[in-house]
């Protein structure tokens, strides 16, 4: 993903096949790629372009001391890969990976957090086999006390949301005269920001200057470009009004496994143009930096965050910031806004009791909000 809100990830992998055997080609050494030059190439590039050292209180120079000799002493590709992956994982950033022909490293910084999601419970006790699969949107109706609530499950922002599918679901909800809508993006690992922008444009009451993005443009700690704005512009034409859900309450369900684009979408919803929307569940997993790609002298590729994004100043309190990201240095960019790299704070925090196999406490709390506004 290039460092821009509306651009796509472009990964270029250069492979040079040598000899006639596929196995020989895959495992052939790269001439001149000694361990020291491979390590130094990665360390220096990340030093110059990574965006969250200050926010995460990371001493990159100290990590060079910690890992460089280990890399030099690595006896084979697997050992070198392990050292480089361990250093990248110190960034605590799930947009950071090292890729070789035999493995891909993963950080998973919130892997041990409560899942707060069980798709089996949703299917058995809420969908009850009456869900429709409309494009990438699984949708059904929840009934409580004579009232109906529309429910949408969106598994991945990698799955395109087209206008026809969205409009079809909205027409169904209008026919059923739902009191509000639940939009579930728990355990959504992200994908295309264009899908987040599409959804936000259908929920925005008016034009919104939703987020700010900064891109690293030099090796210095403060070498960034002027913040760019992400603008959400809804279609306000009369023909599109029935497909904008702005007249009733919306609950967006999140957990720590809502990452990347599944954090950008909730971050957008913090703007005042979405005052009918509440985030319910657990804080998101974050991922506010868009990844940039690079290649090492031995032909391995890697990626790391080359931008940082913010909810504009004044929309997130210090208390909320610390609740979502207690280990972060929020003073680093507080005058610009809240950096949601380690999570977007929810409006209503609630955890599931996974011992209760017939109830989703987060869905139940969402229904309460839709019914009462509280």
Predicted regions and their residues:
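Bacterial N-terminal signal peptides that target proteins for export
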Residues: 1-9
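C-terminal motif of bacterial Sec signal peptides marking the signal peptidase cleavage site
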Residues: 17-21
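Flexible, low-complexity junctional segments that flank or bridge functional domains
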Residues: 22-233
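C-terminal "post-core" interaction segments
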Residues: 25-40, 190-374
């Amino acid at each position: 993903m290039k460092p821009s809100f509306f651009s796509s990830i472009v990964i270029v992998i250069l492979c040079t096949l040598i000899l006639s055997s596929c196995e020989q080609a895959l495992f052939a050494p790269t001439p001149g790629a000694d361990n020291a030059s491979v390590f130094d190439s990665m360390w220096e590039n990340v030093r110059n372009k990574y965006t969250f050292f200050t926010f995460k209180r990371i001493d990159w120079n100290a990590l060079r001391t910690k890992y460089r000799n280990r890399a030099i002493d690595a006896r084979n590709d697997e050992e070198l890969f392990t050292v480089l992956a361990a250093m990248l994982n110190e960034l605590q950033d799930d947009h950071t990976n090292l890729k070789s022909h035999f493995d891909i490293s993963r950080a998973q910084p919130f892997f041990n957090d409560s899942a707060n999601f069980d798709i089996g419970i949703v299917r058995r006790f809420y969908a009850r086999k009456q869900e429709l699969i409309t494009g990438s949107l699984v949708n059904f109706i929840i009934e409580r006390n004579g009232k109906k609530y529309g429910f949408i499950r969106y598994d991945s922002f990698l799955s395109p949301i087209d206008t026809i599918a969205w409009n079809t679901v909205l027409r169904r909800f209008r026919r059923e005269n739902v009191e509000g809508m639940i939009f579930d993006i728990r355990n959504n690992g992200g994908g295309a920001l264009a899908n987040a922008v599409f959804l936000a444009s259908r929920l925005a009451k008016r034009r919104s200057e939703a987020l700010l993005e900064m891109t690293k443009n030099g090796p210095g700690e403060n070498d960034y470009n002027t913040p760019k704005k992400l603008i959400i512009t809804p279609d306000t034409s009369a023909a599109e009004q029935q497909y904008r859900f702005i007249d009733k309450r919306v609950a967006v369900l999140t957990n720590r496994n809502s990452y990347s684009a599944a954090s950008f979408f909730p971050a957008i919803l913090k703007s005042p143009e979405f005052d009918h929307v509440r985030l319910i569940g657990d804080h998101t997993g974050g991922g506010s930096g868009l990844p940039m790609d690079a290649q090492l002298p031995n032909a391995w590729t890697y990626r790391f965050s080359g931008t940082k994004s913010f909810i504009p100043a004044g929309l997130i309190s210090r208390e909320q910031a610390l609740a979502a990201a207690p280990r972060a240095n929020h003073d680093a960019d507080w005058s610009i806004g809240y950096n949601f790299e380690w999570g977007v704070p929810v409006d209503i925090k609630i955890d599931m009791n996974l011992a209760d196999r017939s109830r989703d406490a987060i869905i139940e709390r969402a229904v309460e909000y839709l019914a009462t506004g509280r």
